[in-house]
């Protein structure tokens, strides 16, 4: 009986062990199936997310890529300016003009009882037109090279944000030189008048930059800056017109043909800049690149035409 009881107890314990092992195996199978289900659900979720991302990428519009003028165009422009400078230095006449400074002086004949002052003009220096033109072309070449190399990243940022300060730096420097060349060709030789006209061109560039910056920041046109640019742009135009009229009325002669063409080129270039500036508010952000290219193209054409006109007008056979 004792042995039978022992055998029964052993069978009970073996049954319990088998039950425990079967339960543990079933629990392991259940956990494995849960892990598989979780992996499958995560894989489905990932596939859905990737499909959604792909569909969103396919449906979302591509952002416009801002590109500036290529280095080849800048290099070709610099080469053109260098060639024109070489032609001007070799083929143009050595026509010199004097720079005067107006001042008051004592009239020795009339100053008997007291000092009598009269207006006078003192010649300061003589300068050749061709070297002024060569200087303009050389400075333009340097600015073109800088804008394509050292200032290339600033060019991209300017187009991206809708404000191009480097363009207005170029406008101020080369525009002031253009005005002085055109003024000297037409007989405006007073130092103060020449510098006033050059300073007015720099003010136009400053007001244009302020207008562009405020328009990009607020989206509203800055009327004060625009009016300031237009008013200051009238100063060099009126000075050139008065000088041309004085030549006809008091000089009883007409200026040479290249002097009239030079004035026309300068006024057309200045008018185009003001026209494009006035239309800045109607230009979208994505059209700013086209506007910047138009500025650069017209500026290059104005300098090239002015150089060709003066070379042809002051040409001398070798």
Regions found by a protein language model. Give the residues of each.
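Intrinsically disordered, polybasic Lys/Arg-rich low-complexity tracts
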Residues: 1-59
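Polytopic alpha-helical membrane-helix bundles and their juxtamembrane interface segments
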Residues: 63-166, 175-318
């Amino acid at each position: 009986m004792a042995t039978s009881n022992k055998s029964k107890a052993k069978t009970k314990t073996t049954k319990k062990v088998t039950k425990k092992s079967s339960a543990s195996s079933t629990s392991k199978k259940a956990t494995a199936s849960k892990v598989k289900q979780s992996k499958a659900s995560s894989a489905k979720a990932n596939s859905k997310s990737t499909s959604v991302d792909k569909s969103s990428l396919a449906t979302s519009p591509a952002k416009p890529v801002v590109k500036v003028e290529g280095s080849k165009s800048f290099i070709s422009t610099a080469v053109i300016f260098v060639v024109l400078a070489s032609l001007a230095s070799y083929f143009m006449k050595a026509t010199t003009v004097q720079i005067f400074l107006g001042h008051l002086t004592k009239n020795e004949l009339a100053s008997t009882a007291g000092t009598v002052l009269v207006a006078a003009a003192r010649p300061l220096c003589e300068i050749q037109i061709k070297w002024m033109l060569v200087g303009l072309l050389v400075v333009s070449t340097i600015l073109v090279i800088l804008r394509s190399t050292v200032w290339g990243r600033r060019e991209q940022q300017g187009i991206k944000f809708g404000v191009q300060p480097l363009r207005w730096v170029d406008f101020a420097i080369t525009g002031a030189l253009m005005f002085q060349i055109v003024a000297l060709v037409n007989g405006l030789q007073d130092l103060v008048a020449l510098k006033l006209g050059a300073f007015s061109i720099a003010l136009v560039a400053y007001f244009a930059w302020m207008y562009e910056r405020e328009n990009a920041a607020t989206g509203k046109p800055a009327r004060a800056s625009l009016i300031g640019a237009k008013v200051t742009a009238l100063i060099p135009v009126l000075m050139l017109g008065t000088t041309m009229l004085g030549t006809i009325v008091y000089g009883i002669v007409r200026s040479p043909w290249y002097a009239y063409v030079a004035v026309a080129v300068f006024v057309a270039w200045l008018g185009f800049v003001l026209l494009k500036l006035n239309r800045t508010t109607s230009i979208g952000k994505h059209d700013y690149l086209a506007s910047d290219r138009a500025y650069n193209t017209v500026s290059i054409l104005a300098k090239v035409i002015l150089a060709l006109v003066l070379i042809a007008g002051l040409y001398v056979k070798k």
